Amino acid sequence: MKKVHKSWESPCMGKSMDLLIYGSEGTPLILFPSAHGDYMEWEKRGGIQALEEQINEGYNQVFCVGDFAGESFLNHAIDPIQRLSRFSQYQSYVMDELLPFISEENSNPYIIVSGVAIGAYCALLMAMKYPTNFQKVIGLCGYYDIRVHMDDFIDNNVYFNNPVEFISNLNDDKILKLISNVDIRLLNYMNSPTKNETQIMSDILWLKYIEHEQYVWDIESDDMWEIAPKMLKDNLF
């Protein structure tokens, strides 16, 4: 399996950002890390091994990006406004740096984005906010309400980065149609700590007539990383 490490000084993040690339061709797949994870997390947790066939056969080229939650939502050394500000910088990094880099590496315009837990939140949020840039999102064991990380702080920035809120109140038919064009998959398993949160997000999407697929696997586990890579593999096609 071809594996390449890339790193550059990110103007958006104000620091060096690492990236691991697996494979050399196929549909681009961006993988966000979970809480306190980094660009190596998917490989360390068996996710890349689970995708070995897709990568080696040229079905997917995988891009594992660096941490966002540890410096933003989970950083309680800074206030909620600063947490969201840091996350906004991360979104800018994805849109203004990562996507142009991927387009130079891979001519396929179809972009899949995925993540586990808070990584699933990031993946879904990016697809909802930028539905013309991402064609498919696979949320794995995700939760989609970031108010749990905001210390009861509420403002417009929280609102527009919180899918359970801004999607619920979105009435612009043009934007809703663009979002409906995204292939949305939300997956979880029976005893997952985020199963209810995934169901809530699915219910909101249905209320807005946004077509998507939502599955709860009939399996139990004490470790979502035991199941999430298998879910991802089954939903890439």
Residue ranges and their predicted role:
Residues M1-F237:
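Non-catalytic cap/lid and distal C-terminal segments of serine-dependent acyl enzymes
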